[in-house]
Swiss-Prot record:
Signal peptide: none annotated. The gene is ABHD12. This is Lysophosphatidylserine lipase ABHD12. Belongs to the serine esterase family. Changing T253R: In PHARC; abolished monoacyglycerol lipase activity. Keywords: Cataract, Deafness, Disease variant, Endoplasmic reticulum, Glycoprotein, Hydrolase, Lipid metabolism, Membrane, Neuropathy, Retinitis pigmentosa, Transmembrane, Transmembrane helix. It catalyses: 1-(9Z-octadecenoyl)-sn-glycero-3-phospho-L-serine + H2O = sn-glycero-3-phospho-L-serine + (9Z)-octadecenoate + H(+); 1-(9Z-octadecenoyl)-sn-glycero-3-phospho-(1'-sn-glycerol) + H2O = sn-glycero-3-phospho-(1'-sn-glycerol) + (9Z)-octadecenoate + H(+); 1-(9Z-octadecenoyl)-sn-glycero-3-phospho-(1D-myo-inositol) + H2O = sn-glycero-3-phospho-1D-myo-inositol + (9Z)-octadecenoate + H(+); 1-(9Z-octadecenoyl)-sn-glycero-3-phosphoethanolamine + H2O = sn-glycero-3-phosphoethanolamine + (9Z)-octadecenoate + H(+). Glycans are attached at N123. It comes from Homo sapiens (Human). One of its GO terms (biological process) is glycerophospholipid catabolic process. Glycosylated; glycosylation is required for optimal activity. It is found in: Endoplasmic reticulum membrane. GO terms for molecular function: lysophospholipase activity; monoacylglycerol lipase activity; palmitoyl-(protein) hydrolase activity; phospholipase activity. Its EC number is 3.1.-.-, 3.1.1.23.
Amino acid sequence: MRKRTEPVALEHERCAAAGSSSSGSAAAALDADCRLKQNLRLTGPAAAEPRCAADAGMKRALGRRKGVWLRLRKILFCVLGLYIAIPFLIKLCPGIQAKLIFLNFVRVPYFIDLKKPQDQGLNHTCNYYLQPEEDVTIGVWHTVPAVWWKNAQGKDQMWYEDALASSHPIILYLHGNAGTRGGDHRVELYKVLSSLGYHVVTFDYRGWGDSVGTPSERGMTYDALHVFDWIKARSGDNPVYIWGHSLGTGVATNLVRRLCERETPPDALILESPFTNIREEAKSHPFSVIYRYFPGFDWFFLDPITSSGIKFANDENVKHISCPLLILHAEDDPVVPFQLGRKLYSIAAPARSFRDFKVQFVPFHSDLGYRHKYIYKSPELPRILREFLGKSEPEHQH
């Protein structure tokens, strides 16, 4: 019995040992699993938080980029819509184009009293008001030669009017668009011309400065004609020259053509920074650059100018002018391209109307920097005028 039971006992012991070892490994595995879960609980949220923050930051950045892009797209569509709408607006309302041509509503310099030219350093200048037509009043400045500045102090309008009959020649100055007769570069030119012994008479067209009326090419030309006749009625046999600048060259050639047709031409015509006609000038103007290649540019932008009665056809007018002609133009003119002034000269020079008169073109090199309105700064200007117009003899008393 003892021998038979020993193997059984040994077998039971081995099974118990095996059972205990298997239960131990299971317990160990269970314990490892618990530790792993505990570690995950401890480390999981801390590791997940940076990932969540990064995701949120990326979403915000993408949202901002999307918002910026949407705003840029809206701005782009608005600009594009405005770009397309402007030509149609101008076509439907030709008066807009007329205002852009005249720019009479741009009054610079601001806050000056045109009744007091002495405030602009013109202490030998008188302010007048003339009435070319009913309901139209224009402001006029008359600057006497600089050699008379002492005698001119405190004198009234009658003294200035009588002074036109002196032996000094007279320049009727027709200014361009925008501003007034008190514009800085205009005042500086009056001073130069006055120092050379000329009377200078200038005015603001109807609708400019303190002048009353509605601007138009016809009205501007009629205002100039009225002032010219007013001068001639007081100047006797003194030479009267007409000087036009920029848009004023269009008024000047309109005026001189009319004077030649009635056989009372001026003694000379001076055109500073002239163009050929208003259509070519508008097409060449810097403001037209963004629309120059727009489909139907002429129909949208140029035809409304013509339909408003604005032509300023210098190229046609010079064919009917019979008096000496001097053209001054700076090569670096950014407003009226130099080639338009040269083209006008090439039209005028061979014209039959000038066969008995001198036609001269004087360019000013771009290095001088005179651009559109600073030719008055040229030290050569007195010599140019003296050679073309003749010497103005100064008088020291009146």
